C-alpha cells in the first residue's frame, strides 16, 4: 500500500496542518501490514532537507504505540496444544518459540485443525497475530478465533487468508483460553508464529 503522510508526495508549507494523524497512520498499518500487505509510507523532505517537525512528531508517536502494542507476547506464557501434529519436528510449541524457521504442521491429509492456548489464569487480550510459513506457500482459506469466557467458547474474530502476516484486533476479552481454528485450507496448514497482546487502543 502506497500512502503519503501528507496530501501529496512533495513538501508544501501550506500542508503543515494536513499531516495524517497518529490514528490515521495506525489504521493504515493495521489494514496493510496487518492484512498480509506491505506499506510504503512517503515522508516528503522540507526545504531544509529534513523531515518537518510535525511529521516527525506523528511518526515517533506511531512508532512508540506499535512498539508497546507488540512488546509482550502473552502467547509465550501459555501452554499450547494442537488437534493434529505431523510429528515432534512440527510441534505446536514452534508457534511461540520466536524462530521464523520453525513451524507447526498437520498431517498431509488434514486441512482443518485447531491450536489452543491455556494461560492458566484470566488474561486480557485484544490483539492476535498469526503467520503462515510462507516459504511453502499461502494455504489457509478460512479461520476462526475463539475465547473461553464464562463456561463457553465465544467467537472474537473470523477471517479468510493469512499469508505472511495477519493481525486481528477485537474488544478486550478476559479469558483463560484461546482457540484458533483453521476451518479450511488448500493443503495441510503450516503456521510459523502466533502472538497475543493486550494493547491500549481498546
Q: What does each model-identified segment do?
A:
Residues 2-90, 104, 126-127, 131-132, ...:
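Carbohydrate-binding surfaces of carbohydrate-active enzymes
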Residues 26-31, 116-117, 169:
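Short, surface-exposed beta-strand/loop micro-motifs that present aromatic residues
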Residues 60-125, 131-139, 158, 162-164, ...:
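Disordered, acidic Ser/Thr/Pro-rich linker "stalks" and the adjacent N-terminal cap
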Residues 127, 177-179:
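Short, conserved beta-strand segments of beta-strand-rich sandwich/propeller modules, principally
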Residues 138-151:
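Short, surface-exposed beta-strand/strand-loop-strand elements in extracellular ectodomains
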Residues 166-177:
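Short, surface-exposed tryptophan/glycine-enriched loops
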Residues 181-188:
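Short beta-strand-plus-loop segments that form exposed binding edges in beta-rich domains
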Amino acid at each position: 500500500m502506497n500512502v503519503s503522510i501528507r496530501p501529496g508526495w512533495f513538501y508544501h508549507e501550506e500542508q503543515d496542518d494536513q499531516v495524517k494523524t497518529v490514528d490515521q497512520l495506525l489504521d493504515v498499518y493495521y489494514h496493510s501490514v496487518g492484512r498480509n500487505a506491505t506499506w510504503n509510507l512517503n515522508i516528503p523532505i522540507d526545504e531544509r532537507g529534513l523531515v518537518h517537525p510535525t511529521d516527525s512528531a506523528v511518526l515517533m508517536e506511531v512508532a512508540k504505540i506499535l512498539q508497546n502494542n507488540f512488546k509482550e507476547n502473552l502467547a509465550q506464557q501459555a501452554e499450547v496444544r494442537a488437534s493434529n501434529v505431523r510429528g515432534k519436528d512440527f510441534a505446536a510449541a514452534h508457534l511461540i518459540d520466536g524462530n521464523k524457521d520453525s513451524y507447526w504442521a498437520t498431517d498431509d491429509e488434514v486441512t482443518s485443525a485447531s491450536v489452543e492456548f491455556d494461560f492458566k489464569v484470566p488474561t486480557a487480550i485484544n490483539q492476535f497475530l498469526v503467520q503462515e510459513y510462507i516459504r511453502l506457500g499461502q494455504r489457509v482459506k478460512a479461520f476462526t478465533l475463539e475465547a473461553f469466557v464464562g463456561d463457553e467458547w465465544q467467537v472474537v474474530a473470523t477471517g479468510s487468508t493469512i499469508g505472511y502476516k495477519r493481525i486481528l484486533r477485537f474488544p478486550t476479552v478476559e479469558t483463560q483460553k484461546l482457540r484458533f481454528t483453521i476451518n479450511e485450507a488448500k493443503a495441510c496448514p503450516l503456521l510459523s508464529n502466533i502472538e497475543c497482546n493486550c494493547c491500549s487502543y481498546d
